[in-house]
Amino acid sequence: MFIGPTGVPIPPPEYATLANLLYVHANNPNQALPILYTPEELYPITGVKSLTLNQSVSEGLTILGNYIQNQITNGPVTVFGYSQSAIISSLYMQQLAAQGFPISPADLNFVLVGNEMNPNGGMLARFPNLTLPTLGLDFYGATPSNTPYDVAIYTQEYDGFADFPRYPLNFISDLNAVVGIATVHTKYLSLTAAQVNSAVQLPTSPGYYENGGKTYYYMIPTEELPLLMPLRAIPVIGNPLAALIEPNLEVIVNLGYGDPNYGYSTSYADVQTPFGLFPEVSPSTLIDAFANGTRQGIQDFHTELQALATQPIEFPTFTPPQPADLIATLSNLPSPEKIVNTAATVISTDYAVLLPAADTALAFATSLPLYDSQLFLEQLVQGNIVNAIGYPIAADVGLVTIAGIVQFLVISKAISQNISDIRALIP
């Protein structure tokens, strides 16, 4: 049974086909792949009138529970969850755990991708016990790792929702991750089978599988840093410049996860791992990593320049407008009424952006100071003065970066709508 991600309440058949081909591998040639409707809304990303995450997840959780109870008598159920539906699936596992796992392990299993509740990397697990009431957003914690059900969780490296840095004081790493929300998190069904098959199985705590653990965690490598995608988009020189700086920038980004060689936390995947302050990396390791990165960057830059030299130069063509075209354009100009209506629509769209901005500001003015004070007191009681001061700062850096990308997405959506409305006026 296939559930959509945020913004896709009713996935098309192609969605289920791809998800099955890449991740689930159900072999039912004579049966249609079942699709389950859930709200999949997320204020403000899916719109200023959308349900909040808490509301959408709550409704989805009820729908999923009812579906499984109705279907379980007909045979085993496999749940495929992506992004928000991975959250719903994780919370359903929590419900089953609280009930003593009433459903037989032979009758239920899960395949999750882009899971914001990954124990070690999920954004909702990195900042435990945080709630933002003005945004209707609770940080739910981690997907249970102690269920008797077979669970496979796939994550792409640098997916900011499912693979958020462990050390958020590293702003560059945070920024790369939040760019990855738009460029990596949305691409799980765009991968090839070879890319999915290249996934690395992540380590779990000693004895996890021997003691009955049944959740398998996989990391799919991402070839290029999301942070450099805007640079690569620059014609001609973009790719060479990105190739030059990427190896060393990757070291900096990866330090946000704890190891300059990996864009994900290499500690146990089944253990909820909250954010920390500084990674434990020796100076010699850093020196070697930057030295190797510098050599690799120069080599890649040279390779890109050689490839650039072999490409023919193409000049743009220009066709001057003809008088007949100008006359036709003038005759099709929009009416004053249409211009006024479009202006009103644009103003309304832009005004709507202010509401989520105000809610975010209120959350940062109320909920965040409370969270910071809790972090401070927890560390102070433990006698750790450095963490008492550093943890609130690290949390703020990470959360402000997340809020920034959310506002950017909201504003970008409004600008896109404005452009579409204005284009409709042009004959």
Question: Residue spans of the language-model regions?
Answer:
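Serine-dependent carboxylesterase/thioesterase catalytic core
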Residues: L61-Y158
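Conserved catalytic block of serine-dependent lipid acyl chemistry
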Residues: T78-F80, Y92, M219-E223, T273
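Active-site catalytic motif of lipid deacylating hydrolases and related acyltransferases
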Residues: M1-P76, N118-G122, Y154-E157, F164, ...
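Lipolytic serine-hydrolase domain surface
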Residues: P13-L21, H25-S50, G122-Y264
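Residues at beta-strand starts and edge strands
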Residues: A106, G212-K214, A269
